[in-house]
Structures are given as structure tokens and as C-alpha cells.
Amino acid sequence: MSDIALTVSILALVAVVGLFIGNVKFRGVGLGIGGVLFGGIIVGHFVSQAGMTLSSDMLHVIQEFGLILFVYTIGIQVGPGFFASLRVSGLRLNLFAVLIVIIGGLVTAILHKLFDIPLPVVLGIFSGAVTNTPALGAGQQILRDLGTPMAMVDQMGMSYAMAYPFGICGILFTMWMLRVIFRVNVETEAQQHESTRTNGGALIRTINIRVENPNLHNLAIKDVPILNGDKVICSRLKREETLKVPSPETVIQLGDLLHLVGQPADLHNAQLVIGQEVDTSLSTKGTDLRVERVVVTNENVLGKRIRDLHFKERYDVVISRLNRAGVELVASSDISLQFGDILNLVGRPSAIDAVANVLGNVQQKLQQVQMLPVFIGIGLGVLLGSIPVFVPGFPAALKLGLAGGPLIMALILGRIGSIGKLYWFMPPSANLALRELGIVLFLSVVGLKSGGDFIHTLVDGEGLSWIGYGALITAVPLITVGILARMLAKMNYLTMCGMLAGSMTDPPALAFANNLHPTSGAAALSYATVYPLVMFLRIITPQLLAVLFWSIG
């Protein structure tokens, strides 16, 4: 058997063994995709014992390409929500998550200086302790750029594997410990979160209001201050028994009922100006109007603003809200449409059908992947990651590398959505498949390279010490920030658990947090809020630590 055939066969075996290990769960908690790393270590040990020779060049290419696939698909997935998560609504959560990253970096630096841990080893421990595989890839690349021998670079994968298991278990232990310390009642926390979300959250709500302000009588909607912007949309108007779709020129009268869509604070302001909320239904049932959700799949409308499509003027149809990547938005007239946007349309059936034809509304297209944008994005990401940034006093130029470059480019492209007929939307199933393939390839190679000396290091070497160092890097930041978030910020426990899981980019921890109260979405929401920024910081941090430690000796 040729070296290439043998290498592919061994990688397939690693994937099978590793995925089997990852699927084994104890009380609902397992290693997940991290099991591939340990599958690689097991197979790598026996490959070394048998004296087999694998193609080192092929392993290197597969490792790097797997990492690129993984970080690129992550960026495409979270790109639409990344910049939104940095705004005020998620600012507090992101600040606490950033604090966890900073404290973790400080603990790593202290351990490195106190115990004189070799640079590749301490970076591997850091990456494993925070269960972040792209950090491992970024750290290995910067070490190679600094001229570190390959044997030392491979030690990073071994120390990563030592610290990884407690990285998984440590966050679960922290959640449990914080629950005991603060005597948390999970049911109460879930109710409080739901109450806060309903009353003051930044979610999109609807309300029916009667026009009671005499100053608004015979005034066009476009002349009513609260309705002439993009914060509140009036999607239906009922006068006596007639329900209609209003336009900006529609004149309102005292006693009219308006169906408004917007965020709670803006709807409250509308009540103050227009009149009181009423229980009267403005449902389209029994009328010649209907409400329908339509998906944007026509390349010809991508990038166009809602106002430029003139749906109200041409078809008498109003867009009441927009769902983008799972986030509900007010359909501002300045919003540019992206592939996969889901629009709530209100109008007559024939008019809605006409608008649907303009927008596309071809569900089958959502299951198709445009491969050209995928490779354009990956190519641009690799180029971005290869740009050197020279910092005075540093021994090597800083680069985003093959982990950071594709991630940043994917975040940007995911946010842009489309350029002409090229769109960077990727169906969730396709995104997940490519992401899982990438991480399996990467971890398989890392495990294979670490397997030869793993048992010796664990039994006769410093493996146990590395596990202890990793436990500190995992636990100290989580416990510190958890206590601060609960005591000072009075953060909801379920929200805090999601934030802690997101700060470690740890899906098993999110699954554990979700199971604390399966019907509450608090943990998942906070996890998604901090995940994009933290993933970026986790990739950059080992590079900064490597250059810092290298420069100060």
C-alpha cells in the first residue's frame, strides 16, 4: 500500500474511533467532536509501535485545510449576528466573556513564568483548557513562524490533549458550584428571564392601538413622528369593519385601530403619542387580506433596500418584519435584502403572490450551496491571514494566519451577505457538514502526531502537571467571572451559564446549560451573543501570548 493510501486509511480509522468515543456519554455529557483527538492519540500510539510511516506532507495539508474549513464555516454561520452582538443589547454579556478570556491569558502567563513551562506546551495547555481547537491551530502556526522546531510544535497538540478533558468537565463543575453557592432555583430563574424578555427585551412585538389623540385626526401616517421612521411599522389599519393595508399617505382618523410592529420601548412611545392599547383583534381571517412569510432567493433583489422595491406603491403590500439568521428585525426601509431573509408580508393574496415572485420564494434554493463563493471566501481569507504586520521589538511579524484570516473574512462576507449574484448564505445542514468535516480532519492529524509519545508523557513525564495547570486555566476565570456576574451584575443564572459556555466556545457545556431548563432559551441566547467575539479572541490570544513570551524570553 502506498504512503498516501495508508495515510487516508489511517485517517478514516481515526475518525471512526474518535467519533465513537465522542458519542459515548456519561450522565448526558460526552467529549463530542473532541473524541476525535483521543481517537487519533490511540491510533497514533499503535501506528508508532508498529513502525508505520505516514506521508508527513499529506498530513500537514489535511490538518491545515481542515482548520480552514472549520473556521470559515463558523464565520459564515455567525457573521450576520456578529456585529449586532457588539451593540448595547449584548454589551454586558460580551464584556464578561472578554474578561474570562483576559483572566485566562493572565493565568497562562503566570504559570509560564512561575513553573518555566516550555512555550509550545503552555500554549497547548491554554488551548485545551478552553476547549478551543482553532486556538490550537493558530498557536501552532505562530510557533512555526517563530522558527520553533517541529518536534516542539507537535508537543502543543499533546499538551492540548492533556488539558482538554478537564476543560469540558471544569465548566460543568463551575455551573454546578455557582448554583450551590448562590442557592439558585432554576424554575424561578427561568420565569424571571421570560418576564424580562417579555417586558423589556429587544425582541420584536406587535400591538393594537386605538387613535385617541385629536392632534392626529386627518393626519397622514408619514406625518406622525413615531410612525414616519423605521422603528415602528404600521402593517394594518381597521376603520369600523374594514381592514386595510396602510401606506405612508394613508390618512388616519380618531377611532382607527392600528396594528403596529416594533421593539417594546418604541411601541410604548407609540402608545404615548397615539392612544391606548386595545384587545380588539386585527386578524386577517375573514377578510380579503392575508399574512404570509416569504423567503428571499432571487439574486436580482439581493443588496437592494426595501424602499427601492416599492412593494407598497406597486402591489399594496407591507413588510411588517424580517427574520435574518434567526433574528427578528423591524423591516426598516433602509435594510438591504440578503439571501435567505424571511419577510412577513401583509396584503391581498394575489398581491402577495406577485411580491413572492419578485423575491424568489423558492425553498429548494435554500438547500443548494453556491461553491464559487465558498472558494472565493476561503482564498481571500488565506490571503488576509498571510499579510504580515510588523510590530517594533517583536521577533516575528504578526499574522492572522490560516485560523484567523478565513474567520475574519467569513465574518465580513457573512455580514455583507451578497455581492451581485454571489451570495455567501450557506444552508445550515451544509454548513454543519463542512464544519464537522474540517474539525474531524484537523483533530485526526493532531491526535496522530501526538499519539506516539502521549502515554510516555502521561505516565513517566509531566502529563499530570499539565493537567493541573489546565485545570487552573479553566476554573479560575470561570469561577471569578461567574461570581462577579451574579453578585455585581445580578445576572440571571441561566443567562450566565450560556455566557460561560459561550466564553469557552463549548457546545457540550451549552447542551448541559440548556438541559437545566429545557423550555427556556436563556442559555442559548447568551451563548450565541458572546460566541462570535470570543471565537475571534480565542484565535488571536495564543498568537499574542506566543509573541509576548518569545520577545521577553
Curated annotation (Swiss-Prot):
Q: Name one GO cellular component term.
A: plasma membrane
**RCK C-terminal domain location, by residue?**
191-276, 279-361
Q: One GO BP annotation here? A: potassium ion transport
Its record classes its membrane topology as: Multi-pass membrane protein
Q: Which InterPro entries match?
A: AAE_transporter (IPR050144), RCK_C (IPR006037), RCK_C_sf (IPR036721), Transpt_YidE_put (IPR023018), YidE_YbjL (IPR006512)
Annotated compartments? Cell membrane
Q: Which UniProt keywords apply?
A: Cell membrane, Membrane, Repeat, Transmembrane, Transmembrane helix, Transport
* Highest taxon, organism lineage: Bacteria
Annotated GO molecular function terms are: monoatomic cation transmembrane transporter activity
Which Gene3D superfamilies does the record associate with it? Regulator of K+ conductance, C-terminal domain (3.30.70.1450)
Chief site of localization: membrane
> Family, per the entry?
Belongs to the AAE transporter (TC 2.A.81) family. YidE subfamily.
PANTHER family in UniProt: K(+)_H(+) ANTIPORTER SUBUNIT KHTT, TRANSPORT PROTEIN YIDE-RELATED
Q: What is this protein called?
A: Putative transport protein YidE
The opening ranks of the lineage are: Bacteria, Pseudomonadati, Pseudomonadota, Gammaproteobacteria, Enterobacterales
